Amino acid sequence: MLPTYFGTSNFLAAFAVWMGVVVLAFAIFCVRRLYFHPYSKYPGPLLGKLTNYYAVYHSWKGDQHIDMWRCHEKYGPYVRYGPNELSINTAAGLKEIYSHGRNFKKSVKYNAMVHQAANTLTTIDKRKHGKKRRLISQAFSDAAFRSYEETIQQKIAQLCTALRRRDDDSNEIVPDGNWGPAKNMSHWCDWFTFDVMCSVIFGVPWSSLTEKTYRNVPHLIEVSNVRVGCLIEAGGSKNMKIDKYLFPAAIAARNQFVKFVNDIIRQGMAMSAKGSLKGAFALLRDATDPETQEPLSFKELCGESATLVVAGTDTTSTALAASIYYLCNHPKVYERAVQEVRSTFQSRAEIGLGPKVNSCTYLRAVIEESMRLSPSAPGPLWRQADAGGATVDGQYIPQGLEAGTCVYAIQHHPEIYPQPFKFVPERWLGPEAVPEQYRSDYSPFAGFTPFSIGPRGCIGKPLAYIELTLTLCHILYAFDMRLPQGVNVNEDAEYQLALHITAAKEGPLVEFRPRTVV
């Protein structure tokens, strides 16, 4: 009940004034963002011009990469996708945003990914990032890669054994020449790449390919990424803390993953005390900055290790599953890749790093085209213009505003990749090998950025190619493979991904027939 001195009419009048002020403020806010903003001249979705929550919504749905591609199809090469975000879908723009020496730094959005300490992926300051990258690169040198090969080969052997099993709960092996039951390759690729990264980084003895103890960890990463992807597009701030009410399952998954990382680091430190620690963790623990002679702190060491596990599991797993998907849906491509591998190697023992693997150029083209159509991180990597602003493909980006290129959109650009939704490995074999209808004035690498480019490009890119090439060589040599009986090949289909920082996926279901090989 209102006090007698505050009558109903006065209350309604005050409420009307208050509402009028709110409406006026909102109108001014909208007018400023739509007509008096440095990005006002650029087309884009209306809600995107007004609020970041347009991007948050599509991040939550997992279709932000598709939506950005559609926006570029509708509006052209320059799209205002957020109030302060300009998406640039040109080969020149890609180079000018991300290459060395550009006046950009990582967006503050990346703060949403920081948990305990900033790592190489999330560090915004260029000088600090340079220090971290110099340290991390010591675990990703050519010599380090050679030392990891034995571990990778062991994991590939375990994967091939798993593909021969009748089912996951028995040791019954499918006889040579017989087709086995369908395998969900999104799961097996996740477990395989997760095992590789944990073994390469920490030298752990267990295997998700043979045991179920840690098989939920890749799923925890996927669930956790839904929340973080939304926080990134919201602007990178976690100060409001409303995410704990919106994403309780994602936070629980994050906490479980952090516990896993802490446990495995403790195992690594225990092995270190015994002098038996191997892998990248040992190299990172002992590494010092060549310029400052400073090592990584313990928190930094934990952060870098966790990031390597996450990035190395998700991205390589998606590329491997996508390659298998496209091979199974394109019989002529499959036959050519099989012929190349089986004519190159006379035994499984010959499949290793060196000239023979490097000579499998068609298989490499299959991998490249698979990553073009279904990139592991298909979204935009936002960059913020530094002091003085920057010019990108003729467009001025004022200081503090952001620009980026959506990986999925640029890798489906019809001028760079004619008939961009067609799976054509020949695009990567040189101009003379490309059928006329798929030829372009651009190099296929002009828009190819599954690992990003420039000083922030993925440091694990060579390791990913090693895993992908060796694994596919072994699978194509040791097995025939096909889609399950009753499932028709579809050469026009694309391996579908959901974007939550990296790509979430399902399938393909594939049947394997072991060959009698040495």
Curated annotation (Swiss-Prot):
One GO location term (cellular component): membrane
Transmembrane segments: 11-31
Keywords attached to this entry: Glycoprotein, Heme, Iron, Membrane, Metal-binding, Monooxygenase, Oxidoreductase, Transmembrane, Transmembrane helix
Gene Ontology process terms (BP): secondary metabolite biosynthetic process
PROSITE patterns cross-referenced by the UniProt entry: CYTOCHROME_P450
Residues involved in heme binding: C458
Keyword Calcium: no
Subcellular location field: Membrane
Induction: Expression is positively regulated by the aspercryptin cluser-specific transcription factor atnN.
Keyword Transmembrane helix attributed: yes
Documented EC number(s): 1.-.-.-
Pathway recorded for this protein: Secondary metabolite biosynthesis
GO MF annotation terms: heme binding; iron ion binding; monooxygenase activity; oxidoreductase activity, acting on paired donors, with incorporation or reduction of molecular oxygen
Glycosylation sites: N184
Function of the molecule: Cytochrome P450 monooxygenase; part of the gene cluster that mediates the biosynthesis of aspercryptins, linear lipopeptides built from six amino acids including 2 highly unusual and nonproteogenic amino acids, 2-amino-octanoic acid (2aoa) and 2-amino-dodecanol (2adol). The core structure of aspercryptins is as follows: Ser/Ala-Thr-Ile/Val-2aoa-Asn-2adol. The first step of aspercryptin biosynthesis is the generation of the fatty acid precursors, octanoic and dodecanoic acids, by the FAS subunits atnF and atnM.
Protein name: Cytochrome P450 monooxygenase atnE
The species this protein was found in: Emericella nidulans (strain FGSC A4 / ATCC 38163 / CBS 112.46 / NRRL 194 / M139) (Aspergillus nidulans)
Taxonomic lineage from the root: Eukaryota, Fungi, Dikarya, Ascomycota, Pezizomycotina
